[in-house]
Amino acid sequence: MRAMPLSIGTIHFVGIGGIGMSGIAEVLHNLGYSVQGSDIADNYNVARLRTLGIRVEIGHRAENLGEAAVVVISSAVRTDNPEVVAARAALVPVVRRAEMLAELMRLKWSVAVAGTHGKTTTTSMVAALLDGAGFDPTIINGGIINALGTNARLGSGDWMVVEADESDGTFTKLPATIAVVTNMDPEHLDFYGTFEKEREAFDRFVENIPFYGFAALCTDHPEVQALVARADRRIVTYGFNPQADVRAVNVEGDHRGAFYDVQVSERVTGEARTIERVHLPMYGLHNVQNSLAAIAVAINMGIADEQIRASFARFSGVKRRFTRTGESNGVVVIDDYGHHPVEIQAVLKAARMAGSGRTIAVVQPHRYSRLSSLFEEFCTCFNDADAVIVADVYAAGEQPVEGASKEALVEGLRTHGHRNVQALPSPEALAGIVRELAQPGDMVVCLGAGSITGWANRLPAELDALHGISGGTAPAAKAGGT
């Protein structure tokens, strides 16, 4: 991979432990740049970067900058952060994460995956198909790819596959060759203000691709289908509907995942063919749909049908996307990042496909603003759960919003007809509640983008202790999710 044309000195990342920031930092480090950073706490990403030799300070202080020549920040970093203040006082450039990602993308041809849900899994699927076909792509993803143990990799090929984060609008700056849009729901309205502004951002994202590129768009989603009509670029559509250029049919599922045929139709020539019996070792129709995006990209890059089948058959998914953390007394525990009502609904339907018993959902709502703006949707997205346990809202730095609380959601679910809902007094009480509720064959699905992932990973051992089981069962990662 080419480097940037000028020497830029040490690159300092504020919030380097974030999933998006850590991936860019890792690729820059592997390109030979001097990279350092800081974060408010240790985490998996910080530990991984340190093993690579990247210096990471815990806590934000002006002195952390050292000899930094450029500072990279995400939208989560406030303007009064002491490192940002010090950088600006010293006339050190402060750039956003998306701007640095865009500069990396200029060095290769790139596939950028956007959408309010499914980006991370779809990005990893595109990367898996390109990797299986020998493209050796550079990858920057929004989640840990199980096969790599990281969310980023510097490849030797000419292509890069990236997740395009729409949360702060900066994805419109990414110079993609191929754009993917999985779906488009009202989200991040604290930034956009209105859904119309969000639509306009997705329009610009697609319009940014060059005339020789194309956009893969999911026409199962009405907002994305409307985008097809507005786009002035080459379009390849995908989905379950009969009008899609890449369509899944004959979908079946069991404990091994999903099996389906893929019909591929050429709009111009009228030619059609079928990729038969694709096996995706993941649960849920939403993941079949995500795979169609990757197939649409792959076939338009000349990847053979048999290679597509082979790559998907060994696909191992993404961390925190329907990840099995363990089992206790016949009860399986799942950890999933889903925190939007659409994602939660899809994950619970996948749990129905994967399990033989009841589904018990444990949800930690993420952000007061999201719970408030989508309250009605949250009250109706748990119908596939036999029981729901609601934890306190994970604030993510926000102040409480009236009517957006654990108690309000419990009452809202009951008012909307759910038969079995209860509040979680504290994380420490979870194992006891699950022990009383769950029976062998049941599945406990922990949902949320906050600290609930730690609860999900501890829960099997805590249940073992309550059942008097010594040793327990070893966790076995199984992918699914969004």
From Swiss-Prot:
Localization recorded for this chain is: Cytoplasm
Q: Which Pfam families does this one have?
A: Mur_ligase, Mur_ligase_C, Mur_ligase_M
UniProtKB keywords: ATP-binding, Cell cycle, Cell division, Cell shape, Cell wall biogenesis/degradation, Cytoplasm, Ligase, Nucleotide-binding, Peptidoglycan synthesis
What is its pathway?
A: Cell wall biogenesis; peptidoglycan biosynthesis
A GO cellular component term found in this entry reads: cytoplasm
Annotated GO molecular function terms are: ATP binding; UDP-N-acetylmuramate-L-alanine ligase activity
SUPFAM superfamilies according to UniProt? MurCD N-terminal domain, MurD-like peptide ligases, catalytic domain, MurD-like peptide ligases, peptide-binding domain
Major enzyme class: ligase
Report the catalytic activity: UDP-N-acetyl-alpha-D-muramate + L-alanine + ATP = UDP-N-acetyl-alpha-D-muramoyl-L-alanine + ADP + phosphate + H(+)
List its EC numbers: 6.3.2.8
- At the top level, the lineage of the source is Bacteria
Q: Which residues bind ATP?
A: G115, T116, H117, G118, K119, T120, T121
Keyword Cell membrane attributed: no
GO BP: any one term: cell division
Q: Which InterPro entries match?
A: Mur-like_cat_sf (IPR036565), Mur_ligase_C (IPR004101), Mur_ligase_C_dom_sf (IPR036615), Mur_ligase_cen (IPR013221), Mur_ligase_N (IPR000713), MurCDEF_pg_biosynth (IPR050061), UDP-N-AcMur_Ala_ligase_MurC (IPR005758)
Which HAMAP family does the record match to this protein? MurC
Do you know which PANTHER family this protein is assigned to?
Answer: UDP-N-ACETYLMURAMATE--L-ALANINE LIGASE (PTHR43445:SF3), UDP-N-ACETYLMURAMATE--L-ALANINE LIGASE-RELATED (PTHR43445)
Query: What does this chain do?
Result: Cell wall formation.
In the record, the note on similarity to other proteins reads: Belongs to the MurCDEF family.
Q: What is the recorded name of this protein?
A: UDP-N-acetylmuramate--L-alanine ligase
Source organism per entry reads Rhodospirillum centenum (strain ATCC 51521 / SW)
